[in-house]
Amino acid sequence: MIDAIQSIGAFSAVKETEAAGSSSSASLATPGTGAAAPQAGSFAEVLGNMTTDAIRSVKSAEGVSLQAIRGEANTREVVDAVMSAEQSLQTAIAIRDKVVTAYLEIARMQI
């Protein structure tokens, strides 16, 4: 079920953005000192990792649910896995809402 989501190709857009961001991250050195700022990862990289973790969490919950149907997992394991997947999904929805709100606010700005 979740495999269909991965085939959409959203990760290719993240990789393109990441490649564009990596060329500009080299210019983040502190002026005058010659020392580079510590690399924390680009925004696209962080979002990509969060998306991958969310997908992994949902897949895990699906797997545990199937194990419970076969009688190989107990109810507590299923509930824990589903709650973790739900938390990941709610986080992804909240981030999406914030990004959309920021985009709409930028679109309303007068130039």
Swiss-Prot record:
Keywords: Bacterial flagellum. GO terms for biological process: bacterial-type flagellum-dependent cell motility. The keyword Cell membrane does not apply. The keyword Transport does not apply. One of its GO terms (cellular component) is bacterial-type flagellum basal body. One of its GO terms (molecular function) is cytoskeletal motor activity. It is found in: Bacterial flagellum basal body. It comes from the Bacteria. Belongs to the FliE family. PANTHER family: FLAGELLAR HOOK-BASAL BODY COMPLEX PROTEIN FLIE, PTHR34653. This is Flagellar hook-basal body complex protein FliE. It comes from Sinorhizobium medicae (strain WSM419). The lineage of its organism: Bacteria, Pseudomonadati, Pseudomonadota, Alphaproteobacteria, Hyphomicrobiales. The gene is fliE.
